[in-house]
């Protein structure tokens, strides 16, 4: 028996079903089911009655839940006391991030950080990667989320990888059928005029020895997606910059894959407060893959 199993039991009873508990705890439904099954196996009793109307505690489950809630309260008290010692109560964490990471990468990690360190307030600045670097240099933020690699003045950690995809009108090419460079060279492209992305796409395209026909250069990713939907051209964007992708647009893999690495950075020469290391622990312990569908 462990704290996580007790937290899951309490969440299932509170929400009334496994799927809602999974959503509340940011877990998969199968992980919730496995945790409850393991707890029941260990105790040798059925704690929850499952049915069409959800999950409800059995008679023994109600008694176990009362004790579990007391244990969870004691656990929270222990965490609170330890955080007081670490300086994580009443602290403040300042984060800078570029837009797609702030939208898709940061929220689940912030949610976990808030669970672990509820006494730390967080502020977020959204800017481009160069702006993230400058904010770190000037001491305006503690941690930055930005594409890697960066210069040696920063200590960095990889968080996830983001595939560049070809965006075409949904009727232009069958989904799942590979694209060739020769096929792509027939399209006019709406180029993503944004920091390192432009350079990465141009350099990658150059390896194909095909002409890149640029019809527009646009900085706003959502504008590019809308233009592709209207048949004004094709585009190559990091997937996280492209989502949500409307039905009129289809995302295809490049003939040769291209990824960007998204990571966290701190200024190597700066003295860091405890909340920075606590957040870095969350980043390191979080699964390294971010999936964005659409």
From Swiss-Prot:
CDD domains in UniProt: PBP2_LTTR_substrate
Domain HTH lysR-type stretches: 1-58
Keyword DNA-binding attached: yes
Gene3D superfamilies named in the record: 3.40.190.290, Winged helix-like DNA-binding domain superfamily/Winged helix DNA-binding domain
Keyword match Transcription: yes
GO cellular component terms, A-Z: cytosol
PANTHER family recorded: HTH-TYPE TRANSCRIPTIONAL REGULATOR YBHD
Name assigned to this protein: Probable HTH-type transcriptional regulator LrrA
Phylogenetic placement of the source organism: Bacteria, Bacillati, Cyanobacteriota, Cyanophyceae, Synechococcales
């Amino acid at each position: 028996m462990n704290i996580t199993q007790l937290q899951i039991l309490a969440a299932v009873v509170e929400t009334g079903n496994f799927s809602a508990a999974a959503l509340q705890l940011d877990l998969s439904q199968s992980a919730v089911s496995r945790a409850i099954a393991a707890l029941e196996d260990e105790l040798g009793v059925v704690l929850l009655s499952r049915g069409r109307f959800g999950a409800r505690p059995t008679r023994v489950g109600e008694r176990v839940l009362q004790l579990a809630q007391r244990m969870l309260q004691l656990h929270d008290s222990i965490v609170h006391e330890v955080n007081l010692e670490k300086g994580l109560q009443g602290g403040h964490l300042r984060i800078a991030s570029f837009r797609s990471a702030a939208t898709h990468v940061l929220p689940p990690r912030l949610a976990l950080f808030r669970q672990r360190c509820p006494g730390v307030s967080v502020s977020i600045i959204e800017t481009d990667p160069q702006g993230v670097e400058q904010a770190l240099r000037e001491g305006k933020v503690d941690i930055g989320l930005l594409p890697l690699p960066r210069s040696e003045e920063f200590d960095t950690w990889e968080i996830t990888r983001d595939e560049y995809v070809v965006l075409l009108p949904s009727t232009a090419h069958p989904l799942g059928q590979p694209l060739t460079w020769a096929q792509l060279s027939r399209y006019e492209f709406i180029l993503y005029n944004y920091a390192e992305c432009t350079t990465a796409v141009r350099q990658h395209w150059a390896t194909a020895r095909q002409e890149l026909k640029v019809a527009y250069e646009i900085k706003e990713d959502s504008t590019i997606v809308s233009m592709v939907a209207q048949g004004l051209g094709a585009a190559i964007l990091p997937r996280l910059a492209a989502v949500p992708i409307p039905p009129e647009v289809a995302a295809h893999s490049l003939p040769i894959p291209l990824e960007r690495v998204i990571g966290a950075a701190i200024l190597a020469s700066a003295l860091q407060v405890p909340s920075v290391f606590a957040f870095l622990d969350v980043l390191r312990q979080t699964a390294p893959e971010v999936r964005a569908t659409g």
